[in-house]
Amino acid sequence: MTSFEQIERTAMRLEIEELRDTPAMPDIFDRLAHKPYSCFLDSSLTMERLGRYSFIGFNPHLVLTTRGLDCSWWRRGGGMQATRENPLSALRRALEERVINEQHPGLPPFLGGGMGYMAYELGRYLERLPGNAVVDLGMPELCFAFYDRIVAHDHETGKTYLAVLHCDDPGRVLEEARRELAKRPPEYLGGSGTGESNFRSNFSRDQYMEAVKKVKEYIYAGDIYQANLTQRFEVELRE
């Protein structure tokens, strides 16, 4: 297995082609959604700064997940590796592994890289915060997948692009990506839904009203000026 000491920053080449006569982005994602860590950043806006583009990332070459200081690195073709470090430092290291030295004016701004999320609890690594949250979901606090295969759609021009990052053999890499996009989506069995009655909240009505009362008291005392009072809903999904 390759050690982190052996991994150097790799300058990647970018190959881009316009996809013609392709389905809409949700239909493209249907063909990829069953693959682990497929990601769809969807926007229907045409405003350039607020949502002009939609992106699909698939078949990532690296996935970084963290819980506390425990970091797990999965690499395509290289298996899993674990480190213990500050999760934000791990994320920075992952971002620096591959670099793109090319500029492509007029094309979508994201053509390869990381998509993921950072939980609110990661704020503990930026400032001293109390750890009062109940940890009962078992989800990573940080999860980022890094993609060298991106489908990008420009809602303003209506053009869709396939972009791949590679070190060599662009024809092979592009053809592999095309084949993945051409596969028929798996058949899913339809269901009748879950029904409203199956949703459960972590607040009772009385508990919620009491929380609202406390928020008002904090505001009146000058301790806060607003609050994001949330509740969590759970529902059992059918297979």
Residue ranges of model-derived segments:
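Extended alpha-helical targeting/anchoring segments
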Residues: M1-E239
